[in-house]
Amino acid sequence: MSERTELIRKLGSSKFNYWFGYAANISLVIWLCSHGIAGGKSRLTPGQWIGWSAVGFFSWTLSEFLLHRYVYHLWESFLSEGHALHHRTPRALIGVPWYLTAIALWAVFEALCLVTRPQITGVVMGFNWLGYILYCIAHHGSHHWSLRWNWFKRMQRHHLIHHAHPECNWGFTTPIWDYLFGTDFDRRRAPATAKPTQ
């Protein structure tokens, strides 16, 4: 194991980092969404809250696909090394160090606030990050839980296929992007196994 990979393993695989990351991320969601409130009053209308939170939550699904495909698999970085470590030891508690996540999220927020209103940016990013937290819970569950819910079983199967075939199934909680971009394992395999028509 290279020195860099060993450092990544040490930074990202402590139980404290893994579990505290959830608390830190929930705090980030609250901090981001608090920009939609000032002096105890909402800075957005109820319709804006609903609309912008939906945009944020939906944007997570595409963010998840793009991060997983490019940052974790195609581009070489400490994040891709950490993700490769996860592929080798899928049940290990490995996560991006919580403080790096917080710094990155703060920097993106500040940059976006240069071109948008902070209350909108905060709500969109807050609900985007809520999607990330739900993804983390579902991802953990796919490797550690055995639930009988059909949705969970489909999601788990989709993800475990990705571990066996890392070139596909990059969308995890929402495989719709794999369908749209042609990276779904079942759809890629279907033409090869389909019987010719008469």
For the regions a protein language model found, what residue spans apply to each?
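Flexible loop residues that form catalytic
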Residues: 146, 164, 185
